[in-house]
């Protein structure tokens, strides 16, 4: 771990000192929502939470570096619609270990192993083991180490290896390079490659939750995940994360989960108060984005989904529209570009 962070620190300094944009005649950044479903429910074919960040040059269609942040159900299907295969990803980053953000990862690495069974390994970046206030250990490293256990126990890994010996005998986990870090209240560089620097910061939701910032010569994006305020209940100034606000200073784009105020306790939805209060409301996220000087706000993981209920909870006032989310963000004071996320919604910097 120590060697890793020494190396990262060196590359961070090198990245700044050399002006990484020199190697890109026309650098560009594309941020795409690979899944926008809020929570583990299924609705209208929405994929589980995930964001693809691509950086490069006009000549390579902004595709020199490809990073996947979270991998909810259906991630590989959405990536296929973008003509991005699992073998093309440089790294996967997890904000936290909830299944709506992770359950598509087994599919992703199984596909890499099936068709690229000798490597190279894929970097997986996530928090080190964290213990919750109730004593539960949240472990990304165990998640990745055991990602293919079901396929091993069923005999599939052995059967496929017997057909093609070039595949690693131990299955997909042997093609994962897990990089863990201890989340802190200050941004730290956790990954770097080809003019791209990724920083992380601790944020509240469950133990080990982290939010990320990607800086490139073409622009920057913060992936907030499901971050909320450290104070689990009111009184508090905002439901938004103060750490994410720190991370997002001057960033071009924020991608963040949101919950609409119609789900708040006492408004008839029946949603569990703890579940509502650990999410960031749309107006509070918008206010935070305004304070941080953000230009583009991409709403994702929306609770409730556009045009649907958040089962098993109710919407006494009726189903929400894209306009309802836009208005809630405007009510929070944000005057920049608002994107109410749908699967495969994309934003390119610079715009073409």
Where are these regions (language model features)?
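Intrinsic disorder/low-complexity signature
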Residues: 19-21, 298
């Amino acid at each position: 771990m120590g060697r890793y962070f020494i190396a990262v620190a060196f590359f961070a300094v090198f990245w700044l000192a050399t002006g990484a944009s020199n190697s890109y005649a026309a650098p560009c950044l594309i941020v795409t929502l690979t899944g926008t479903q809020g929570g583990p429910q299924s609705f209208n074919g929405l994929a589980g939470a995930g964001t693809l960040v691509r950086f490069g040059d006009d000549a390579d269609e902004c595709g020199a570096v490809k990073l996947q942040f979270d991998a909810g159900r259906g991630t590989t299907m959405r990536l296929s619609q973008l003509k991005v295969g699992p073998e093309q990803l440089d790294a996967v980053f997890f904000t936290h270990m909830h299944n709506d953000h992770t359950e598509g990862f087994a599919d992703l690495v199984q596909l890499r192993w099936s068709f690229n069974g000798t490597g190279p390994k894929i970097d997986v970046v996530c928090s080190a083991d964290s213990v919750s206030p109730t004593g539960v250990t949240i472990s990304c490293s165990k998640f990745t180490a055991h990602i293919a256990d079901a396929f091993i126990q069923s005999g599939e890994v052995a059967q496929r290896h017997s057909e093609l010996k070039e595949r690693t005998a131990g299955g997909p986990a042997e093609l994962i390079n897990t990089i863990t870090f201890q989340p802190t209240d200050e941004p730290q560089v956790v990954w770097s490659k080809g003019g791209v620097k990724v920083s992380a910061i601790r944020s509240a939701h469950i133990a080990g939750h982290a939010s990320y910032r990607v800086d490139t010569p073409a622009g920057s994006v913060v992936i907030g995940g499901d971050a909320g305020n450290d104070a689990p209940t009111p009184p508090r100034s905002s439901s938004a994360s103060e750490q994410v606000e720190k991370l997002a200073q001057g960033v071009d784009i924020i991608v963040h989960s949101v919950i609409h105020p119609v789900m708040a306790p006492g408004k008839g939805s029946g949603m569990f108060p703890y579940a509502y209060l650990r999410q960031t409301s749309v107006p509070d996220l918008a206010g935070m984005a305004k304070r941080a000087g953000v230009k583009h706000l991409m709403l994702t993981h929306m609770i409730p989904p556009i045009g649907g209920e958040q089962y098993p909870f109710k919407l006494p006032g009726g189903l929400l529209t894209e306009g309802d989310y836009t208005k809630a963000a405007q009510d929070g004071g944000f005057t920049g570009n608002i994107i109410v996320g749908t699967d495969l919604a994309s934003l390119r910097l610079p715009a073409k």
